Amino acid sequence: MVESKQYKVALVLYTQGLDYDDRIRKEILSIQGLFNNVHFKIFAFTPKDNREEEGVTSYGVPYKQLYLKSREKYPSGSHTLAKSWDLYKTIKKETKDFDAIWCADPETFLCVLLLHGKPLLWDLHELPESFMHNSLKRALFKIAVKNTDVMVHANKPRLKYLVSSGLISDESKQFVLRNYPQFDEIDNEYDETYESFVNWLGDSECVYLQGINAEMRADVESIGAVLAVPDLKAVIIGNVSDTRRAIIEKTFGKDQLNKRCFFTGQIKQLKTPQYIRKCKLSLVFYKNVKPNNWYCEPNRLFQNLINGNPVVVGENPPMKEIIDRYGVGVCAKTDGSNVEEITKAILSLKENYECVQAKVEECKNNWLWESQNSIIHNIVIKWLYN
């Protein structure tokens, strides 16, 4: 292949919303910054919005949202194979004039398995748990892996888990691209929600809680630990389901929540640093209920660190390794299930706050997305130029 050639890349994506899919945005923009001859178009399907739409993302990349007839025909959660086959046929037709394919997440498995003849990259943000405990699915997954030119994983523990599980054997085409934030990921326009938060917070110390929208993310335990520390408040970023909100209100009472917890609802990724910079620390927990949780190191962990906030995390291997190596927070002696241990970790961090925050300031540039440019370059070379 010649570097002057212009490459049209089709990116196949299952997403809750393109403007909220931060990792994809960073990957595309980084590749286009390093290779001005690589051009993307996103082909997206979403869990709720089954309609066709074309446009341009907020970061300037053309997209097409796909309509799948099978999703209209069959109820949600049923006829998965028929829907997957429908997606494959649609993608095959849509991408016939493209030079290369980028598939994101396990949901695009059938496309990875059946699309041939073009350079193929499979970006596994999540572990393919549905393929791990069924012999037929495992066999099909291994075939799909062989069909790829490059695979990308969110961190080393996830890749090691797939290797130890016997799902991956050829490590020469495996790359790790961690979901670090970008330094300029901040919106300088402040909306009414933020102004209301600032007025509500006053001079109080605040804990940053993002994405605690499920029991496995220790929502009740995290809020309970904050409320156990006098004069500490919390800001909860992101949507909380009616079911979880009802449980939280029943556990702590509406009056106490109104005084010490501020719920922002869904906000755009670029606005999150506004709230982080008003907080003293963050809690990040994923209970050990499945591998995707246990091997997680979410973007909000790194967002807090590059913005100067120490963190309290659970014993999950990727997050614990960061705390043990750099001393930028406290690792609680729990996966998030024990409120008392989380509270102890918060108090420990507060007692040693100046020392820990100094380490955060010293190390925070280690977790910038741009630090991985050489990895991204090698991924593209292996994918398109081999």
What are the residue ranges of the model-derived segments?
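N-terminal strand-loop element at the rim of the active site
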Residues: 13-19, 30-82, 158, 168-173, ...
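Nucleotide-activated donor-binding/catalytic signature segment of Leloir-type glycosyltransferases, i.e.
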Residues: 238, 246-274
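Conserved donor-binding/catalytic core segment of Leloir-type glycosyltransferases
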Residues: 8-13, 152, 181, 194-217, ...
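A charged, aromatic-enriched C-terminal amphipathic alpha-helix characteristic of glycosyltransferases
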Residues: 22, 192, 334-340, 350-382
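Membrane-proximal helix-turn-helix segments that form the acceptor-binding/catalytic region
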Residues: 29, 85-92, 110, 122, ...
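Glycosyltransferase donor-sugar binding loop
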Residues: 47-48, 210-212, 233-248, 265
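Nucleotide-sugar-dependent
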Residues: 22, 214-218, 270-275, 282-303, ...
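A short, active-site helix/loop in glycosyltransferases that binds the activated sugar's phosphate group
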Residues: 111-112, 146-174, 178-186, 247, ...
